[in-house]
Structures are given as structure tokens and as C-alpha cells.
Design a protein with these regions (language model features):
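Switch/connector loops and helix/strand junctions flanking conserved nucleotide-binding motifs
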Residues: 17-21, 48-50, 62-65
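RNA/tRNA-interacting regions in translation and RNA-turnover enzymes
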Residues: 1-31, 99
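Conserved beta-strand -> loop -> alpha-helix junction used to position metal-binding or nucleic-acid-contacting
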Residues: 27-43
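C-terminal structured domain segments across diverse proteins
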Residues: 7, 40, 50-53, 65
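Conserved "right-hand" nucleotidyltransferase catalytic core of DNA-directed polymerases
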Residues: 14, 22, 45, 53, ...
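Generic structural signal for secondary-structure transition and capping sites
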Residues: 7-8, 62, 226
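General beta-strand structural signal in soluble alpha/beta enzymes
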Residues: 11-12, 30-34, 64, 173, ...
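A short, structure-level motif marking secondary-structure boundaries and short turns
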Residues: 2-4, 35-37, 114-115, 145
Length: 267
């Protein structure tokens, strides 16, 4: 009843807490205050971890989870299953105390920054919406991805054959060095091409897009890259993220990760 009542709920990365509680049948209702979001709004270029904020804003050194937990199965994961209850209890109590202290400081700073209206009317209301989206997940049909991957793979093979036929010899299109040597050394599309600090020719998308009108092979190379990215980043990768429990992908949405304000998706 307390978590579903009208009292303000304060947390650091509160979205994570909402999802954990919801997975255990507890639906937390607002109002909310997230110290991580507050600091990210007023100081976007700085680190927003609780340990850092405690040092900078409270002049307090917190208990570090890495000092009491064991390494997890995955990189950057920590396993707390073997931590004694009294040790974990002290860590958790400090976590709650520091979050409350940080909220008092950050509420004042958000107000002084002139961004309180933005924070209260846009960022905080968005938080539970994103938590719901992450918890619900995105339905994905693996068989559809597999069919699309085969189709795009055929397009990639066709583009590779056409490019190598036009070049007159085999060409590793995934090697920026080979590609640069071919376009600027062999074809000499530009008299004074740009080079990287290591001396290689620059072959990024902007450079090739500007050269596309000069030679049809450049347009094919751009199309090859676009389809390769589609296949490797999405069609072949997404099935690995499907949760076996419900057949959905549960990503993480970040509302403060980009300077432009757009949502960023991770995992």
C-alpha cells in the first residue's frame, strides 16, 4: 500500500527499481523523483553514478558494491548471492540514505537551473512510461528475421559480385584500407584525398556519398555497407536478445543519454 500511495518515491535510476518491483507483483505509483535523471538534466557532461554524486555533492565516500560482491558470470556484472545479510543490509541502508540526501541537494539545483518545469512535466512523467515499455518488451518473430536475413544476404552477395566485376579483381569491402587504396590509389577519384592519422585514406559515409556521382561503383559500395549493417546489426543480432520466457526483446531505453534529447536503446 505504501508504494502504491500518494507519497513521493525517490530513487537513483528509479526505472530499474520500478521494473524489479513490478516483476514481483508490486506496481509503484507516483509521484517520483529520480536523482540520476535530475543530475543528468543539469549536468549532462558529467558522470551520474551514486558513488560519484555522493563524493561531489555530499563529500561522502560510499560503500562500493565491487568491494563486497564477487565477479558475475558476465563482464561488468557482480554477484551478491554470497554477501552476508548484515553486510548487504548496511550497503542497502546506506544506498537509501544517500539517495534521500542527494534528492534534497538536486531538487534545489534543478530549481536553480530553471529546468524544474521540464523535469516535472517531461522527464519524470516519461520514466514510468519507459519502465512499462521495457517490462512489456517488443514482440519479435525469429522466422521473419531469418527470412529477411537470407534475402538481404543475397543482395549483399550480388553487390559484392558486381563491385568486384567492375573493379576487375577481388576486393575486401570490409577493409577500409583496401577500399581506400582502390578508390583513391587505383581509381584516383580525388586528387588530394583525406587521410586518417595512421595514413589510411578516409572512406566514411560522408566521403563516399560525396563521390557517388563520380563513379557508379561508389554507390554500390554504399549500398553494400548499408545492407551489411542491416544484416549484422539487426537481422542476425536481434534473435540473440529474445527472452525465452515470453518471446520478446526487453531493451533498455535511456532518456538522458543523447545530447539531442532523443531516446537511446541498449541491449
Amino acid at each position: 500500500p505504501l508504494l502504491e500511495g500518494p507519497a513521493e518515491k525517490i530513487g537513483h535510476h528509479l526505472k530499474f527499481d520500478l521494473e524489479v518491483l513490478r516483476a514481483n507483483g508490486i506496481h509503484v505509483k507516483g509521484p517520483f523523483f529520480d536523482t540520476l535523471l535530475a543530475h543528468a538534466l543539469i549536468a549532462p557532461g558529467m558522470k551520474h553514478g551514486m558513488d560519484v554524486l555522493a563524493e561531489n555533492l555530499l563529500q561522502y565516500s560510499t560503500i562500493k558494491l565491487k568491494d563486497i560482491a564477487a565477479p558475475g558470470a558476465k563482464k561488468r556484472e557482480l554477484d551478491t548471492s554470497g554477501v552476508p545479510v548484515e553486510v548487504m543490509g548496511k550497503y542497502s541502508a546506506e544506498d537509501a540514505d544517500i539517495t534521500l540526501q542527494l534528492s534534497a541537494v538536486l531538487k534545489r539545483q534543478v530549481k536553480e537551473s530553471g529546468m524544474e518545469k521540464l523535469f516535472r512535466t517531461v522527464e519524470l512523467p516519461l520514466l514510468p512510461v519507459l519502465a512499462d515499455m521495457e517490462f512489456s518488451g517488443i514482440r519479435v518473430l525469429p522466422e521473419s528475421l531469418e527470412k529477411a536475413s537470407v534475402k538481404v544476404g543475397a543482395i549483399i552477395d550480388g553487390l559484392r559480385e558486381r563491385i568486384e566485376e567492375a573493379a576487375g579483381h577481388p576486393l575486401n569491402l570490409n577493409s577500409p584500407k583496401q577500399l581506400g587504396d582502390f578508390l583513391f590509389g587505383e581509381l584516383e577519384l580525388v586528387k588530394k584525398p583525406k587521410k586518417t592519422k595512421t595514413g589510411q585514406f578516409v572512406t566514411d559515409e560522408d566521403t563516399l556519398s560525396a563521390l557517388a556521382p563520380q563513379h557508379p561503383i561508389v554507390a554500390d559500395i554504399l549500398a553494400y555497407r548499408e545492407n551489411m549493417k542491416l544484416k549484422s546489426t539487426y537481422l542476425d543480432a536481434l534473435p540473440r536478445y529474445i527472452c525465452p520466457r515470453d518471446g520478446r526483446i526487453h531493451t533498455q531505453f535511456h532518456q538522458m543519454l543523447t545530447a539531442t534529447g532523443r531516446l537511446a536503446s541498449q541491449d
